Amino acid sequence: VNDDVQYDLGLVRMADDRMIYVNADATLKANGTYYLSKTNGLLPQGYYPFDSNCILQLNGWFTCDQGTTYYQNGVMHGAGWDNIGGSFYYFDSNGYIVTGMVRVPYPTANLLPGYGPDAEDAEVNVPGKDGNPDNYDYPDRESAVFVFDENGVFQKEQCGVYNDNGITRWINNGMLVWHAGLVKDGDDYRYFKRNGM
């Protein structure tokens, strides 16, 4: 045994995305809630629970500097769509929820039926093609622009006019409509070009 070896690794994410805490004496936190001071940027300093197998037990929503994510049995959520508590969310490639108007892949038909590409979207999304001379980023066979609130909840009930950072857009069931054309908005009519504006 070499007494000069330092084991104070602190919080460590393992290959399976679960986390452990390695103390200075090479022991692991287990069976209790402990104040973690050396979190290595994975979590803020604070009190966290560990099970008998030394695994950090995060369950539920968690917000840190990188964003908001969801943990289940100590494992951070991966990328993609999910239904949590009856609300739909999209998690980016780092496992954090998206907010605002964001282009993401379509959800699976099992999760959200009716939210796939339509023939017109896929046909017009060719840069430089007639109908797309300005190379707008139209929906395609893989993804489209969806609306999420500040908590990351997909706004599937939202329909009508939507202010996208000063640009007026037309939304139908939480999804940007690129080819809305003439639409009735209350007592007025609005015309939306193929670019969704």
Which residue ranges define each predicted feature?
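Extracellular adhesion/carbohydrate-binding repeat motifs centered on closely spaced tryptophans
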Residues: 1-197
